[in-house]
């Protein structure tokens, strides 16, 4: 089974405090940096169970983006990316967790994912259609998601990522093979 995943790699910064969160205050705690991104996490898990997986993504020329890309390649993942650019850093996700470890706030910058746009996808659509399954996340813009549903002739699996981004899939519900 051949699977192609289209979406983002994030550099996740996760801050957790041991104290009650108070607005406008600095809180002692711990900060961890880790590889993330819904699509990247799925790709890693598929590779670890020895599935044939290809990843369409975009990373910046920064240390973490290049490292996380290299880590996936070492697992046997084939990566397809738009041409390199200095315009963007890799996607960054910042979460603030409370003392119970529950995420209270998060902010994400996925500007680099704009390189995986309708025009770029149209240049590789024939390749995409050679796979058995196509998995997308909703970090892609609406035009790109619409184009994929119009042109892909294989089952499309979607991860909605968040409540806010899930609305991008509403008009395609009847075409989605699996939705998470």
Features from the language model and the residues they span:
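Glycine-rich phosphate/adenosyl-contacting loop at the front of the ribokinase-like
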Residues: 1-58, 63-77
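Ribokinase/PfkB-type carbohydrate-kinase core domain
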Residues: 1-9, 71-84, 96-180
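Short, glycine-/polar-rich solvent-exposed loops and beta-turns at beta-strand/coil boundaries
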Residues: 86-88
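Short alpha-helix plus adjacent loop in nuclease-associated cores
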Residues: 90-95
């Amino acid at each position: 089974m051949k699977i192609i995943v289209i979406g983002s790699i994030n550099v996740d910064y996760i801050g957790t405090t041991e104290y009650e969160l108070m607005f406008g205050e600095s809180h002692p705690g711990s900060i961890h940096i880790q590889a993330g991104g819904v699509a990247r996490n799925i790709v890693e898990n598929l590779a670890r169970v020895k599935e044939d997986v290809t990843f369409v993504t975009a990373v910046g020329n920064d240390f973490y983006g290049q490292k996380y890309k290299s880590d996936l390649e070492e697992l046997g993942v084939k990566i397809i990316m738009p041409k390199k650019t200095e315009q963007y850093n890799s996607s960054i996700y910042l979460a603030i967790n409370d003392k119970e470890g529950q995420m209270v706030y998060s902010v994400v910058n996925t500007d680099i994912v704009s390189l995986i746009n309708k025009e770029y996808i149209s240049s590789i659509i024939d390749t995409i259609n050679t796979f058995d399954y196509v998995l997308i996340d909703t970090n892609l813009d609406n035009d790109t998601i619409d184009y994929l549903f119009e042109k892909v002739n294989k089952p499309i699996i979607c991860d909605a990522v968040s409540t806010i981004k899930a609305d991008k899939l509403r008009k395609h519900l009847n075409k989605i093979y699996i939705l998470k």
